[in-house]
Amino acid sequence: MTIQSEAALEEGLIKTLVGNSYERVIIKEEENLRENFKRQLEKHNRRELEVNGRTGFTDAEFDRILLHLEGGTRFEKAKKLRDLYTLQTDDGKNIWVEFLNTKKWCQNEFQVANQITVEGRKKCRYDVTILVNGLPLVQIELKKRGVELKQAYNQVQRYHKTSFHGLFDYIQIFVISNGVNTRYFANNPNGGYKFTFNWTDKDNKPFNELNLFANFFFDKCTLGKIISKYIVLHEGEKSLMVLRPYQYYAVEEILNRVENTNKNGYVWHTTGAGKTLTSFKAAQLVSEIDGIDKVIFVVDRHDLDTQTKSEYDAFEPNAVDSTDNTGQLIARLSGDPGLLSKFNIKTNSKITITTIQKLNCAVTKDYYNKHLQDVRNKKVIMIFDECHRSHFGDCHKNIVGFFKNLQIFGFTGTPI
């Protein structure tokens, strides 16, 4: 029986990517990488350049872009990737430079290169690199069939110690494969092998074979979406996290229902499966949909209110608001300037965490609900935590009866 070589596996993957409309580009060393990055960045920002009567960046301007990108930790660079950069041009103008289109992720420029040589403490050659707008955002390390997959993971760890630097600090995702087993993980050197994951379909059937994995995961729109929306920059740990497939599909289904139907739904994750991360990402992405006025995350105890706020803040500080009492809840839901001022509320997010008890009080007592007559008719999404406990009884009935344009999603770790 002939065992497929690593080189054959590499060429087969590149052929798959080219078949999915990736541009194959020959990059042998870092200087080639920078030259290609300049061309791709100009292509990606051509509209902004044209508005300013330009076709590209001068060498001095590009050096300033590189200098901006070189500074900071790996975590800070992940933020820079997603932010706009204000470039001061040679003639004194300011223009916006975008490194990644996170809103229309299919509109990024995708390329594939292989065997890029990088000099660090040691000279290393990387197997397959996916470039997005010229930046290396996905690195794939391959081993021939029959070789233990963890050897590819260990090789990535060695690269962290000996060669990754410069633009390669912008890698967001690693993929390792021996052809018959394929796993992916976020660029978090301290995560460990346990944080490498198989991809699956919606029915949890794993895409172990590299060609199956590549045809789905490396679809340009899918990969662009995962990098743009499903990598979490964990502020508490200053590290990158990538969602697992069941988390991805759960959030995608919630988004689909919100955008296209009025159906409710619930998500069941087993204990330890990352329910908090899934619910955070769902709330965050739902809040970004046009026409959604408020997202309310409902817990059934005050201690869970505080705990959830703390956990969400670890993912992204101040992404959500909490409420200490019903008055604050009314102020946040109504957005009334007078009430916000009364409770000294400076900012008011679209996402609010509260208890079912405070919410029930807000909708049943005239003293409070008179301030909610406007929001009760707006599009409101409620996410109930531990919905096997809170999705029943008079409180739930009162809340559902009050809001006229309400859509509900429940999360639980207990089978319903």
Predicted regions: what they are:
Residues 313-365:
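Inter-Walker segment of RecA-like/P-loop motor cores
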Residues 177, 354, 411:
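Short glycine/serine/threonine-enriched helix-capping/active-site loop
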Residues 160-162, 283-284, 336-340, 366-371, ...:
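A generic local structural motif
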